[in-house]
C-alpha cells in the first residue's frame, strides 16, 4: 500500500509539474484546413480543373487538414522552439475515410545561440522551409521543404542570409539533396525589397550504382513592392535539368526532383510571375495572378503503369503557357462578402505518352457568397456557397460528352 501511494505521489507530482510548465509556456496551436463538396452537371460529384492556372475558388474537390503544435522555451537570451505538424488529405466522399497521416513538420529552431548575431536561427528536423506561394491559385513556386537543417537570418549588413541542406528523395541508385541559399531584405527604392534564392539539387550514388539524371540549379529573384493599398510581387525563376522542367510547368519548384531518368538533362526553363492583393475603394478588394512559363528541350516520358513508366522517349520539346487569374471581392458588411474569380490558362504541353505536344486551354468562372470572421481579403474562417463554370477550349469531351461543366458547392476554409 505504501509503495502504491508513493507511485501515485510521483505521478501527481509529474502532472502538477506539467500543468505548471503549461501555464508558463503556452503551447501554440496552429493549422489550416479546407473541406467541402459539390454537385456537377455530369453527375460526377465535385470537379476541379488545373487550379494553379485557373484559380482555386470553387475549384477544389478535396479535403485537406494541417494541425500544428509549437512551443517556445526560453533560457537566458536563447529561445528554443519545438515545432510539430500532422497533415492529411482525402476526397471527402464519406464520413469516415482511411488515409495516411503525414508528419509534415517536426523540428527544433534555436535563436540566440550566436553571441555575434542574436537574431540568427539554427534548426534541424523536418520543416516547411521558407515556402513561397500564391494563395488564390495554391501555387507554391518555391518549396524546398523536407528533412534537414541549417541556419537562417544571419546578418550580412542589412540583409539576411539563410543556408540549408535538405534531403530530397531516395531510390535504388542514389539519394537526392538540396542545398538552399537565400539572401533577403535587399533594400531597393521606397517600400521595395528583393530576395534572391538558389537551390542546387544533387545526388550521391550508391555503391555500384549510376544515377542517370543530371544535377540541376534553380535561381529565383523575388521583388516585393509595398503599396498604400496593398502589395505586389514579381518573381523570376530560371532552372536547369530537372529544375528546368519544373520551372516550365505549374509543378512547384524545389523538391520532388526527377531522379532515375535522363529525360530532363538538357532541359532549361523559366517563369515570370506577378501577383498581389489591393484595396479598390472602401468595399472592394482584389487579388490576381499573371504568369508566363516556358521551357526548352523538355524530354518526353512514357506514361501508364508499365515497366517503361517515366522512361525517356528520346524526344524533347519546347513548351510554354500563360495564366491570368483575378479575384475581386465586394464586402457587404464586416462579415458577408461576394467573391468573384475568373481564370484562363493555355499553352502547349507534352502529350501522347511523351511522344508529341498538344495545345491546351482551360477557363473558369466562379461566383461565391461568403461569410468570414472579419472583412479583410485574408479573413478566415470563411464559409462559401459557390457556382463554378468550367470550360475546356481544346477538348470537346473533357467533361463526359461536353467541353463545359457547371458545379454548385459549399466549402469552408480556415487558418489560425
Swiss-Prot record:
It comes from Vibrio cholerae serotype O1 (strain ATCC 39541 / Classical Ogawa 395 / O395). GO terms for cellular component: cell outer membrane; pore complex. This is Maltoporin. PANTHER family: CRYPTIC OUTER MEMBRANE PORIN BGLH-RELATED. It catalyses: beta-maltose(in) = beta-maltose(out). InterPro entries: G_neg_Bact_CarbUptk_Porin, Maltoporin, Porin_LamB, Porin_LamB_sf. It comes from the Bacteria. Gene3D superfamilies: Porin, LamB type. The record marks 32, 64, 96, 231, 378, 415 as: Greasy slide, important in sugar transport. The record marks 140 as: Important in sugar transport. HAMAP family: LamB (MF_01301). Belongs to the porin LamB (TC 1.B.3) family. GO terms for molecular function: maltodextrin transmembrane transporter activity; maltose transporting porin activity. Induction: By maltose. It is a multi-pass membrane protein.
Amino acid at each position: 500500500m505504501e509503495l502504491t501511494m508513493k507511485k501515485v505521489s510521483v505521478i501527481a507530482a509529474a502532472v502538477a509539474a506539467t500543468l505548471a510548465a503549461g501555464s508558463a509556456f503556452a503551447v501554440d496551436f496552429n493549422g489550416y484546413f479546407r473541406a467541402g463538396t459539390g454537385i456537377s452537371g455530369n453527375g460526377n460529384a465535385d470537379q476541379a480543373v488545373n487550379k494553379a492556372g485557373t484559380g482555386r475558388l470553387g475549384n477544389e474537390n478535396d479535403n485537406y487538414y494541417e494541425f500544428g503544435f509549437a512551443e517556445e522555451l526560453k533560457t537566458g537570451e536563447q529561445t528554443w522552439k519545438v515545432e510539430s505538424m500532422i497533415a492529411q488529405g482525402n476526397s471527402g466522399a464519406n464520413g469516415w475515410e482511411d488515409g495516411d497521416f503525414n508528419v509534415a513538420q517536426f523540428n527544433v529552431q534555436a535563436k540566440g545561440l550566436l553571441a555575434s548575431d542574436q537574431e540568427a536561427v539554427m534548426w534541424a528536423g523536418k520543416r516547411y522551409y521558407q515556402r513561397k506561394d500564391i494563395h488564390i491559385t495554391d501555387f507554391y513556386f518555391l518549396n524546398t521543404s523536407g528533412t534537414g537543417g541549417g541556419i537562417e537570418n544571419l546578418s550580412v549588413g542589412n540583409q539576411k542570409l539563410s543556408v540549408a541542406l535538405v534531403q530530397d528523395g531516395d531510390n535504388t541508385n542514389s539519394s537526392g539533396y538540396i542545398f538552399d541559399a537565400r539572401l533577403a531584405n535587399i533594400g531597393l527604392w521606397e517600400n521595395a525589397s528583393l530576395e534572391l534564392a538558389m537551390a542546387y539539387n544533387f545526388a550521391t550514388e550508391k555503391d555500384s550504382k549510376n544515377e542517370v539524371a543530371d544535377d540541376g540549379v534553380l535561381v529565383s529573384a523575388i521583388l516585393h513592392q509595398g503599396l498604400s493599398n496593398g502589395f505586389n510581387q514579381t518573381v523570376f525563376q530560371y532552372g536547369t535539368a530537372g529544375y528546368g522542367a519544373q520551372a516550365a510547368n505549374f509543378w512547384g519548384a524545389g523538391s520532388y526532383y526527377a531522379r532515375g531518368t535522363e529525360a530532363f538533362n538538357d532541359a532549361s526553363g523559366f517563369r515570370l510571375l506577378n501577383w498581389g492583393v489591393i484595396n479598390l475603394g472602401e468595399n472592394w478588394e482584389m487579388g490576381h495572378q499573371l504568369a508566363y512559363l516556358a521551357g526548352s528541350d523538355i524530354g518526353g516520358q512514357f506514361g501508364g503503369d508499365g515497366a517503361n513508366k517515366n522512361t525517356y522517349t528520346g524526344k524533347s520539346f519546347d513548351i510554354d503557357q500563360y495564366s491570368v487569374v483575378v479575384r475581386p471581392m465586394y464586402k457587404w458588411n464586416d462579415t458577408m462578402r461576394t467573391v468573384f474569380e475568373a481564370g484562363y490558362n493555355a499553352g502547349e504541353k507534352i502529350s501522347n505518352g511523351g511522344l508529341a505536344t498538344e495545345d491546351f486551354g482551360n477557363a473558369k468562372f466562379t461566383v461565391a457568397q461568403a461569410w468570414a470572421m472579419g472583412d479583410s481579403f485574408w479573413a478566415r474562417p470563411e464559409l462559401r456557397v459557390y457556382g463554378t463554370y468550367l470550360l475546356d477550349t481544346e477538348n470537346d469531351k473533357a467533361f463526359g460528352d461536353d467541353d463545359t461543366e457547371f458545379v454548385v458547392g459549399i466549402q469552408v476554409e480556415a487558418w489560425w
